[in-house]
Amino acid sequence: MTRSLKKGPFVDHHLVAKADKAVTNKDKKPIKTWSRRSMILPEFIGLTIAVHNGKQHVPVYITDQMVGHKLGEFALTRTFKGHPADKKVVKK
């Protein structure tokens, strides 16, 4: 179920404050955040946000096509190592 339009997008207030500070200071350092639930706003375009995936912070460069998505969509939490190979016994 999607979020009601009358409520607007959810973004943690500390993330917006850090983004505004980075834009005014023209700071290129990644903004560290644990807020995977925050929606990407148009003000974030051009910033690099380091999103926590449970183990480390994954740097995500924000482009215009990402607006409206959640930050957690771009920092994967699980790594797929492939299915194990079949170990069939060969009779001689």
UniProtKB/Swiss-Prot annotation:
GO MF, one annotated term: structural constituent of ribosome
GO cellular component, one term: small ribosomal subunit
Protein name listed in UniProt: Small ribosomal subunit protein uS19
Residue stretches in coiled coil: none
Transmembrane segments: none
Keyword Chloroplast appears in the UniProt entry: no
InterPro entries: Ribosomal_uS19 (IPR002222), Ribosomal_uS19_bac-type (IPR005732), Ribosomal_uS19_CS (IPR020934), Ribosomal_uS19_SF (IPR023575)
Function of the protein: Protein S19 forms a complex with S13 that binds strongly to the 16S ribosomal RNA.
N-terminal signal peptide: none
Keywords: Ribonucleoprotein, Ribosomal protein, RNA-binding, rRNA-binding
Species per Swiss-Prot/TrEMBL record: Polaromonas sp. (strain JS666 / ATCC BAA-500)
GO biological process: ribosomal small subunit assembly; translation
Tagged with keyword tRNA processing: no
Family according to the record: Belongs to the universal ribosomal protein uS19 family.
